[in-house]
Amino acid sequence: MAEGDEAARRQQPQQGLRRRRQTSDSSVGVNHVSSTTSLGEDYEDDDLVNSDEVMKKPCPVQIVLAHEDDHNFELDEEALEQILLQEHIRDLNIVVVSVAGAFRKGKSFLLDFMLRYMYNKDSQSWIGGNNEPLTGFTWRGGCERETTGIQVWNEVFVIDRPNGTKVAVLLMDTQGAFDSQSTIKDCATVFALSTMTSSVQVYNLSQNIQEDDLQHLQLFTEYGRLAMEEIYQKPFQTLMFLIRDWSYPYEHSYGLEGGKQFLEKRLQVKQNQHEELQNVRKHIHNCFSNLGCFLLPHPGLKVATNPSFDGRLKDIDEDFKRELRNLVPLLLAPENLVEKEISGSKVTCRDLVEYFKAYIKIYQGEELPHPKSMLQATAEANNLAAVAGARDVYCKSMEQVCGGDKPYIAPSDLERKHLDLKEVALKQFRSVKKMGGDEFCRRYQDQLEAEIEETYANFIKHNDGKNIFYAARTPATLFAVMFAMYIISGLTGFIGLNSIAVLCNLVMGLALTSLCTWAYVKYSGEFREIGTMIDQIAETLWEQVLKPLGDNLMEENIRQSVTNSIKAGLTDQVSHHARLKTD
């Protein structure tokens, strides 16, 4: 059977990863799991469940595809539907157990022991034989990542609970966080999506719970919470901290009880803690309904250093196997199963398909802010603070020049002051020590300049409002329109152009009504939008009609005066010469 699979795989291109998968036969039992050869021969990361032949037996199916070129994710809807919409399970409440955490920390390795339990849960020796290779989700030793996107086991287990109900159990494996090919957004999306869709999220950590582990958890869960609809309760269900390679059993013993004591100590909010540390812990408590922790010993040197290790129990330390026998039933025993709920309602297999579709669309869009690395977030905050400080220097200085209690200042003087103070603000910005480098900081300097120009435009309007002639521009314009229409109406009526006279009277009436309305708005402060509209119309008339007309008349008058002066001068000169000749 393995040879047939190998031949089928050779015929498929690597792009087959995107091909739609066929649903496995759920009646296939444990024999398929235990009869496979080592994972290196049976399942490869690039050959996940692409052919009908492979799909006839239980195996991992990638339902969320990771595109490395554009750092985007795609849901394989058909594969997910074929797994969860099988007739015998689609209306059952679902239990989703997911394992997430940093890459190369043994998530897939742990899930394969969960598979052994699910196929042999009625046996005391479910953990397997000493010489049996570990198969199921693909895993291997080494330092490079193995899993990408999100995978699920294509056989959904139907379990009878002690209360007589049946539930469907789905096991989920996720792409490891913080590898060299994933952005912070990639890591946050995978972790958030798996947390949103799982009822139990196992947070797989190595050796200890570091403060940065909690900060990343805060970031990832907040990214998930933002994508969910407005809810008034804790958005996620159970988070199980799984501390691998625990080296301090003399302080906190292996297992659940020692983990509980350790977690209480780590997540305790103390009065003397910095506010940032308190906020991280409060956020985690507010996001999850249940928190737990399990301390797991190191599996042994053979596991860590043997390149040919294939999961055989004979190579694993007894302490690890003993605690593993306690951990897996704690998560998957019928009496311990946690059914998936969203907003207090149980979720069926059919419902979960729709939630997956809705959530992936959110993360494919641009509605959510992009999470950033700590350096980038700190650099942005640092530069924004420098921008705010420099802008404040500019605003305070300009207030001294043309603030509310200062008299009107000539526009040319105001512009000169603006340019001087703008340069002072830019020097202030440049003098602040900032993170991110020159190119990064240049964007914020451009932002500062734009904000200063916007503020300057407001100061110009404020200064113009103090000019009595500017304040009287609207009534003067309307009065000029009324006067002009009155004269034109009289002249056109006198020569018999009654239609034009009526039109001029109508315009004069509108101008008079506008003038009265404007006066009422300025007096009462009501209907300010109407007053603004009248000001804008008057401004347009002034700039486009009256001012050019006045300038032309002024130029014509000046030109005529100069011409007359020249003529008078020439006449005087000619007269003077004539008198001289006569004399």
From Swiss-Prot:
Gene that produces this protein: Atl2
Chain intervals for the UniProt region annotation (Autoinhibitory domain): 547-583
Pfam (any one): GBP
Subunit and partners: Monomeric and homodimeric. The homodimer, transiently formed by two molecules on opposing membranes, is the active form mediating ER membrane fusion. Interacts with REEP5 and RTN3; these proteins are involved in endoplasmic reticulum tubular network organization. Interacts with ZFYVE27; both proteins are involved in endoplasmic reticulum tubular network organization.
Segments crossing the lipid bilayer: 477-497, 500-520
Keyword Disulfide bond among record annotations: no
Function as written in the Swiss-Prot or TrEMBL entry: Atlastin-2 (ATL2) is a membrane-anchored GTPase that mediates the GTP-dependent fusion of endoplasmic reticulum (ER) membranes, maintaining the continuous ER network. It facilitates the formation of three-way junctions where ER tubules intersect. Two atlastin-2 on neighboring ER tubules bind GTP and form loose homodimers through the GB1/RHD3-type G domains and 3HB regions. Upon GTP hydrolysis, the 3HB regions tighten, pulling the membranes together to drive their fusion. After fusion, the homodimer disassembles upon release of inorganic phosphate (Pi).
Residues binding Mg(2+), per UniProt: S108
Polar residues bias spans: 24-39
Cytoplasmic compartment spans: 1-476, 521-583
Name used for this protein in its record: Atlastin-2
Source organism of the structure: Mus musculus (Mouse)
